[in-house]
Amino acid sequence: MKAQGETEESEKLSKMSSLLERLHAKFNQNRPWSETIKLVRQVMEKRVVMSSGGHQHLVSCLETLQKALKVTSLPAMTDRLESIARQNGLGSHLSASGTECYITSDMFYVEVQLDPAGQLCDVKVAHHGENPVSCLELVQQLREKNFDEFSKHLKGLVNLYNLPGDNKLKTKMYLALQSLEQDLSKMAIMYWKATNAGPLDKILHGSVGYLTPRSGGHLMNLKYYVSPSDLLDDKTASPIILHENNVSRSLGMNASVTIEGTSAMYKLPIAPLIMGSHPVDNKWTPSFSSITSANSVDLPACFFLKFPQPIPVSRAFVQKLQNCTGIPLFETQPTYAPLYELITQFELSKDPDPIPLNHNMRFYAALPGQQHCYFLNKDAPLPDGRSLQGTLISKITFQHPGRVPLILNLIRHQVAYNTLIGSCVKRTILKEDSPGLLQFEVCPLSESRFSVSFQHPVNDSLVCVVMDVQDSTHVSCKLYKGLSDALICTDDFIAKVVQRCMSIPVTMRAIRRKAETIQADTPALSLIAETVEDMVKKNLPPASSPGYGMTTGSNPMSGTTTPTNTFPGGPITTLFNMSMSIKDRHESVGHGEDFSKVSQNPILTSLLQITGNGGSTIGSSPTPPHHTPPPVSSMAGNTKNHPMLMNLLKDNPAQDFSTLYGSSPLERQNSSSGSPRMEICSGSNKTKKKESSRLPPEKPKHQTEDDFQRELFSMDVDSQNPIFDVNMTADTLDTPHITPAPSQCSTPTTYPQPVPHPQPSIQRMVRLSSSDSIGPDVTDILSDIAEEASKLPSTSDDCPAIGTPLRDSSSSGHSQSTLFDSDVFQTNNNENPYTDPADLIADAAGSPSSDSPTNHFFHDGVDFNPDLSNSQSQSGFGEEYFDESSQSGDNDDFKGFASQALNTLGVPMLGGDNGETKFKGNNQADTVDFSIISVAGKALAPADLMEHHSGSQGSLLTTGDLGKEKTQKRVKEGNGTSNSTLSGPGLDSKPGKRSRTPSNDGKSKDKPPKRKKADTEGKSPSHSSSNRPFTPPTSTGGSKSPGSSGRSQTPPGVATPPIPKITIQIPKGTVMVGKPSSHSQYTSSGSVSSSGSKSHHSHSSSSSSSSASTSRKMKSSKSEGSSSSKLSSSMYSSQGSSGSSQSKNSSQSGGKPGSSPITKHGLSSGSSSTKMKPQGKPSSLMNPSLSKPNISPSHSRPPGGSDKLASPMKPVPGTPPSSKAKSPISSGSGGSHMSGTSSSSGMKSSSGLGSSGSLSQKTPPSSNSCTASSSSFSSSGSSMSSSQNQHGSSKGKSPSRNKKPSLTAVIDKLKHGVVTSGPGGEDPLDGQMGVSTNSSSHPMSSKHNMSGGEFQGKREKSDKDKSKVSTSGSSVDSSKKTSESKNVGSTGVAKIIISKHDGGSPSIKAKVTLQKPGESSGEGLRPQMASSKNYGSPLISGSTPKHERGSPSHSKSPAYTPQNLDSESESGSSIAEKSYQNSPSSDDGIRPLPEYSTEKHKKHKKEKKKVKDKDRDRDRDKDRDKKKSHSIKPESWSKSPISSDQSLSMTSNTILSADRPSRLSPDFMIGEEDDDLMDVALIGN
């Protein structure tokens, strides 16, 4: 072992020694030092290369050192540039001189030119294949030594080419991006050249926003939105004025334009597509060349709009974007979260504060003098039951430059919504128990609407402001408050504030301060509100009463708290309900003037309390919504029955609230208490300018919002602005309290309904009457009403001439004008296509939705308005509602109200202004204009409804064409028509007023739905109400619901509160209803109003007005679809019986609302008929027809109108806009509501009916009775059409049936009116279709019936439709029921006196038998009504005479249930006849009418009077017979061609509505009726 170890040791040593030897040998050689240094350098360089790739931490440290060094020399600058290039993965090198540094990549290079001192000379960028171009932005950054920004530019250039494919493909993609940028730049220049817009306008409205071209590495930037808070300096809080040179890239919301690779292939243009330098339209759309293989290439890339921060958008918005671009927004399904939660995160991310805020969706805002707490209810259910969901988007794909403007508009809309919601999100921390901390709940209602609920600043109640972001610059606002709540502010005011600040906290503070100001300025308001509330409480119908049932409408009030939660339907439903109830509320507020007087007059107070019973119903419907009794109705009722009261009320003209709040239309709006009109989203502009700016321009932006916008406009303009009045009814805080009380009470509720349904469209109505009245008009209106009551003429007075109504805009005239202004109507109605005023009126009537709210209100009113019913003489319900507000005997009380109602109607309520004479004077020429300006007023005036012959009916008809259209519009708009109708009828002496009230229109609008409901419910007003909680038409509800209507109708279940005995005994001799006459007329009118509320009710009303027989018929109708029908009949009847005698008949017929459907509805009708006859030949003609057809059409009409209406609007049974839309359909489709209205101011709903009615009128007086029932609704002019319509209905053709030359003559006279009605009649736009619409109406009725079933949901959603559908709905119900109870309708005895004592069954004092079972059977034909549509058409078209002739046949047909369908058709005919009858009115309704209108009108008046007297007797007999045979089969009724058929038809409709088994009337009935109608009309003449 030892030897071995030694050996190893020796080996090691030897190795070591050999190694050392070798080392010595190697290094012993002398090497130069230079070689050693070289070796060291090599090693060092290798280390640097290795470190750059492998030691990032070391590199970052070196870069930090570089940044810390000051660049003061050329080497330092080049070193820094090379360092930046390395950071971005780019190469760099210096030029030989060392003064140029090149930063390079495969696709581009940047050349930085320096001087020897290191100072920057220039920076150029050269893209692949291009010459270098100097970049000022890069020069600026480097001169300022801003190397970070320079580095960002380099990064941007790199990302620009971060595309798939080789360099050649990348070059094509760059060319595509360049061509896109060139096109967008051209679009920006085109916009600027066309508008010379400044930076802010470019940002908010520019087709491509504010465009900043691509520069260096910054992509092309489109600045598309900036909020008011963005324009405030963060440090000084002073506003920033934008100039071309101070718009920073970071300001506001921006999107960059780029191109990115995609997995799919897209055809992208590689050359500019814009040809020329001028846009091809007013939207600055350029002319693009088509995509071809020459100018485009398929690339695996696409254009993108990219956002710096992901934007929260709703699920619906994502779908809209994808529909716009045609390209999926996300490659994979995105995750959705509550939108409000995303908006909250987005807002909080703007603050650099890293500390998370534990907000739990509750945020605090500290404002000067106020502290707010906002709870964002992110999980609130929408109508579809789901919460509002959203997601984040960071980029949007598109292929064509033409898509960019569309995309930007969508994004602006979403961002504006986000901005409002985000304005509540603040990091402010406050203690929950802080004293004076105000609580607000923000609840989503849809992707563009939300509600802010808070406690009323003065009262202990909940208030809700619904904001609808129509687009980025228009926000429409509706304030919903209790009927008796103190004024807060107007919708216009709120909208102006919102649009100015786009901040909810700032807006809430402004609202509170405004409310405090108003309270300080109007100390009497609270007293008035209390008085009204007490009165209402004393007289409120049972909660189950129709009015309450209508709480659907009331829901809005409760909905106010949380529109979404209040209504089962969902936030939107609630919203709509809210609007309805608000409108109702408005009406109640409308009593403001009265209340004000009350507060000042202890005697007045006591009187009101004594009589409050009748009036209280009006407010009740709205009240339920806000659980606030409708003070207004009681007032109306009280004043109606007390001349002293009237005088007291009218003595206060000086105190006009208009004057009080005149300066602030907004306040006036609010006053209406329905301030949160359903038009909720109508006027988006409201907020921007608090008071000065006129929102009308902005309003127009959205049709749904149109209503709202109009409201805004009127508010801005001031009480005088009709639009404002119309739209602002709900918003009109001031006026509603005062004058609008009756009007508002009665009709406004109806309007809200349409608005809620908007369909937006809303949009809009509630405001109409309330708002109008609210203005200074209130006092005038009240005084006028008193005067008018004393000298019936005053009714027409309100809207003597276009000028007058304008003058009285704030009061009723203006309101009406405004209301019926195309604008206004458009606002409410999506489709306000009526070129003809008649169409507008029809629309107004056809806006039952709008009226529906009124109806809701009326519903209540009707329920507790049996007395009113008597006063009204026609429909216990609708009329009562209306009456209560405008007509019930409280002429004084509702002086303002009546005027307002008239305004709504379009009839100048300020009869005092025009007086009968004035009305007359304006009748012809003014009529047309008036009609346009004030549907009701105009129609009334032209018809000389003042004359009272067809008075309200005739005027309605006259208005019917033009006026009706307006009325319709109005009704739609402000629900004022309904109000008006009441008012008009209430004024009674105001045929014009009646016309104005075209309660048919308004009511029709509301009523039909109600009717539908009522029909569906059959007899339970309450049910009816509840059926459409949201927008139960007051009128319709009222008619149906109240004992009178409902009672009368088979559905006693309506369980209406006992309706005081309403004995409308109007001296026959009085053509012009004096005060008493006026009362009855007003009563009639009220009925009409009610009717107007409901489509078919409207018809019924008209009928009542038309003749006693109509009234009776109405009764029958009532039995059938009594609830709604009655109202309708009554209402129209009262309108029809503008003349004293008519009024009387109306009164009589109204006398026993409860007695029988007819009694309630028909009574009025009968009286109307009689009155109408006195009117004169045309009047007579029209009236008789009217009186009979009115009722029947009224009843049948809703279905018909609905149907037809439904055509255009019908499709929208669930579509509020459509239904409510003032489309020709609406108006022409009078059958639906609109049809009738179209023909005549009030004819809208009775258009179809009118037609039938027309025939009826023409037929013998006895026939007349029936006809009146069906035609009354339409009025004389309408009647012609109606007959024709009826005929058409039975035949299924409108024009085919021209039975008599005499009828033709009548039709010719009415033609214009008819024509007007016609277009309305035709759902679409055709005037002729008016009758047609009726036909359609029938189908509609079935549809409406469905509506009835779906009513609540649909109601909201189709408030407008509802107007139509309402009409239709009633009609539908009617239709269904009509078919079932057609007989009932056909044999009805119209009792002028409806004495229904507290639940007692109505007794008929004066009976007129509606002898046309055929009429009833006509209902059975209702399905034919669709065909009948044609007859409706004639009404509308110039060929009306022919159609009208046919109409007579139809009149016979009236018995034929189609009249329900006919309802519309009849309505049209009726309207035509009405127009004819009330030439002036007709003129109103129809411009052409004016030619023959004046002389014929006078003649009509006289002849009509005679005919009326005859008819009255006849009607009484018929009524008796009818009473006997109310339930009798239609056949017996059919025996009486005119009266029976038409009346039956109408009645039948009504009856059907009442759930009476429908009897199918043979077609032949139509023929007989036509003949009879013709005879009556001729004889009457």
Curated annotation (Swiss-Prot):
GO cellular component, one term: mediator complex
Region (Interaction with VDR): 542-788
Motif (LXXLL motif 1) on chain: 604-608
Chain spans, region Interaction with the Mediator complex: 108-212, 215-390
Interaction with the Mediator complex and THRA: annotated segments: 1-670
Sites bearing Phosphothreonine, chain numbering: 804, 1031, 1050, 1056, 1215, 1440, 1457
Protein family membership: Belongs to the Mediator complex subunit 1 family.
Record protein name field: Mediator of RNA polymerase II transcription subunit 1
Native source organism of the sequence: Pongo abelii (Sumatran orangutan)
Lineage of producing organism: Eukaryota, Metazoa, Chordata, Craniata, Vertebrata
Gene that produces this protein: MED1
